[in-house]
């Protein structure tokens, strides 16, 4: 197959499920020369009011199968670094319990994988940043301000992961943090979550990243007594690495993406986006 020009250049993906959004980004890399997209802007809708994240099982299963074969972390494990969905289920809707469970368990998470987790985890940075109001629990601060009064400035609904004091280091490679920042935009139609990455590993981490961000957004929407409307992820450089694009083991995953990522009408999603943009502009 003749390759299209180099994949460096902006790519916008707008889909009603995270599997298809991730699949389209991967197919763009596969079908173009080079292993990177810069920048990648990925937007997902289709979220249900009960917090269920829309996925295409064929793509998710094919990816998890390949990750397992390559001895890499599963989608669920990567997502857990951003939002501990299992603990939220145990907490049964009590966010104070969720934060307490995570704080108590965090030393064990670090001990289970000291090489990758020695610098921290994303949810840990969001809830125990080390300084700031609410003992560094940025999510609790956002929610307490949202609940406490009307007319709160919109710039208040943001949380940082990157910390110059800890993360400006001269290491040749740094696994954490790639996610820099998240922000939340309540609208009349629902909550929009935005996430910003300097770099992102498309094969190894991106799908799990998107799932974790969506779960975080669904949690925040639940606590704001609304629903998750849209997830936007902005990536400076999305890289397809640690696996060659010519690896035969990729073929089942590529086939699943091609079978499920064909263009489909999305009038409803377009209407939602227009309405959300109008609300944000207002």
Language-model features: where?
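Terminal, non-catalytic protein-protein interaction segments that mediate quaternary/complex assembly
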Residues: 1-282
